[in-house]
Each structure stands twice: as C-alpha cells, then as structure tokens.
C-alpha cells in the first residue's frame, strides 16, 4: 500500500511543491531487500541515487527511525521519506521587488512575506514571486543560484497569508532546515481572525486533510482513522473575543495544505474573509443593513483570509543556536481588529 503525504508546509494551489513526502507500508509477503532498491522499484520517477541521497541526508525513516540506504525492508515496515521535487522548467529571474528581510547571515535569511505574493513561480504566476525577489536580493552572492533546487525556500505559505519564511543560502542549510521540518522540531504559530465565538479558551483539532471531492481547489477534513487524507493536528488558543468573531493563535503540529483554514472551517469557525472556505459569508451577527454594511467594510479593509504566520523557530543549521522570530501583525489585520474592538465598545455603551 502506498500513501502519498502532503508537503511540509501550507501552500497555495497555484504553486508547485518543494518536496515530495511519501509513506509506504511494506506488504506482508515482501522478502528482505535494500530500501534504496525497494523504493526505486516502486517510484518510477526516482533514481536509486536520489533515494540514497535522501537516506544519507536523514530523510528516509523506517518505523519513525532514520535508516541508511542499505537497510533491508521487512514486512510491516512503515517507510516515510522526503525527496526534493524534480526541478521545474521555469527559469527564475531576479526581479527588483521590495523584500522585508527580518534576519540574514551567510547560511540563511528569514523574510516577512506580504499577503498577495506567491512564494514561487508556477502556473499563472511566473513573475513577481517571493523567490524572484530573493534572487535579486542575493544577486551579488556568487554561490547562490535561485534555479538550484539545493538552495532557496525551505517551506511555503499561501499566497494570501502573510508572515515568516526561512530561505536557505547553502545546500547544507537547506538540508538541515528541511530535516527539522521533516522531523517536526520547528515551531510555527499563526494569528487568525475566525468567525463565531468559542465555548473554550483553547483546543486541539485532529482530522485528516485531503482534497475535497466536491471542489478540487479546497481541502476537506476526514476522520483521523480514515484512509482518506493525511494526518493533521492543529492547536488553537483564544486571544481576544469579539462576540461574532474571535482572534486566535494556531500552532501547527503538522503542516498540510490549507491546514488551519480547513480545520477551522471543519469545527465551524471559517477564517474571516476566506472566500474559498466560506469566510466571506456573514456567518454571525445581526440582520440589520447597518451590520451588513459594517461587515462588507471589514472585508474591504482586509480583502483576504485574516491569517498571519506570526512566529517561526528553528535551530540554526551552522551554529546550532536556537533561532526564534516574531512578525508583527500586518496593517490590514491590525486595522481589522481595531475595527472590531470599536464595534464591540459601541455595543457596550
């Protein structure tokens, strides 16, 4: 049985994936054979050398433990691995686009992505992306080539999500950072404004995430024990309540495509302004024309899903030092929260 696992970080549907994640359960009748040979025979698009490189880098696990390429598979083994995606045909050109650099050294840079910017060239978005801006920023660094898959973005966030991303300048940095995402040792938290009030102050959402059979542009949530979708866990904590909407912090335990957006929709709290997941409907509040006009003004103030990648933490790939970064809320979300605070104050008068 072969189970294809989603990438390590949320991504927009109009961009390609950074990595290919796979999960394979070895059949009961399988005879012992080297894992590099076993995987090559099952993945027609992958060479044996590609599998060996992944194993050497620590990206091949059996029963949750890293193994080398000479490991011999056994019946019932659960194999998980991460492979670099074959490089795209699109040539990445350096473009003079403003870039908000939060931190930079010889090995990496942390950037604060604006909402509305695609992270990587893909179908319909060949220019104006974050990596085009990175290529310009690093144009005087001879060792960095934006077209080299061994450097560059380590993870992604959606086009209309703002916030922190880490970019690797060297192959070693990308390999070590990628391994941290693979092993789930990074820390990432998001701030979001969602519809409706919560009965509790914090909670945990567990549910597999896979393509919505009714809409291929959306993800849907399936039971945790289902064979459909990929395991996903989101933790949330209420930061501020506005009656009809709630400001929350979300912490990723996994990182599936549209994970926070799909999970919040699933528990009845769609992201405010998230058109794809029903967040542009007036889901809570009054029926008056005044209230409806107020909500429409809110949507205009923040014309996207109100989701921001607030914090990012990882171990530096060269120094071994813990690195933690925080990005302030962007202006559109800050103004949106202020508008709701003023609205609630008006109700209290």
Model-found features: residue ranges?
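RNA pseudouridine synthases
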Residues: 1-349
């Amino acid at each position: 049985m072969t189970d294809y696992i989603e990438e390590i970080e949320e991504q927009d549907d109009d961009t390609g994936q950074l990595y290919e994640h796979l999960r394979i359960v070895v059949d009961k009748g399988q005879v012992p054979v080297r894992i590099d040979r076993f995987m090559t025979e099952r993945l027609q698009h992958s060479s044996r050398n590609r599998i060996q490189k992944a194993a050497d880098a620590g990206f091949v696990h059996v029963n949750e433990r890293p193994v080398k390429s000479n490991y011999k598979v056994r019946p019932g083994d659960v194999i998980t691995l991460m492979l670099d995606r074959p490089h795209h045909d699109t040539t990445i050109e350096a473009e003079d686009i403003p870039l908000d650099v939060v931190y930079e050294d010889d090995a990496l840079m942390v950037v604060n992505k604006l909402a509305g910017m695609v992270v990587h060239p893909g179908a319909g978005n060949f220019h104006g992306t974050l990596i085009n801006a990175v290529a310009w920023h690093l144009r005087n660094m001879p060792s960095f080539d934006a077209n080299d898959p061994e450097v560059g973005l380590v993870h992604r966030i959606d086009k209309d999500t703002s916030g922190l991303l880490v970019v690797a300048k060297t192959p070693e940095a990308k390999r070590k950072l990628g391994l941290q995402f693979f092993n789930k040792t990074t820390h990432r938290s998001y701030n979001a404004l969602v519809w409706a009030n919560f009965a509790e102050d914090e909670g945990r959402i567990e549910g597999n995430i896979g393509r919505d059979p009714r809409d291929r542009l959306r993800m849907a949530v399936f039971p945790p024990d289902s064979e459909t979708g990929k395991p996903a866990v989101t933790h949330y904590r209420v930061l501020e309540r506005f009656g009809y909407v709630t400001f929350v912090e979300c912490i990723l335990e996994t990182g599936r495509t549209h994970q926070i957006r799909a999970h919040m929709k699933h528990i009845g709290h769609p992201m405010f302004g998230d058109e794809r997941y029903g967040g542009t409907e007036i889901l809570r509040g009054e029926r008056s024309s005044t209230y409806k006009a107020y909500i429409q003004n809110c949507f205009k103030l923040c014309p996207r899903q109100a989701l921001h990648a607030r914090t990012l933490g990882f171990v530096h790939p060269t120094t071994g030092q813990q690195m933690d970064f925080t990005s302030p809320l962007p202006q559109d979300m800050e103004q949106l929260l202020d508008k709701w605070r003023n609205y609630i104050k008006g109700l209290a008068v």
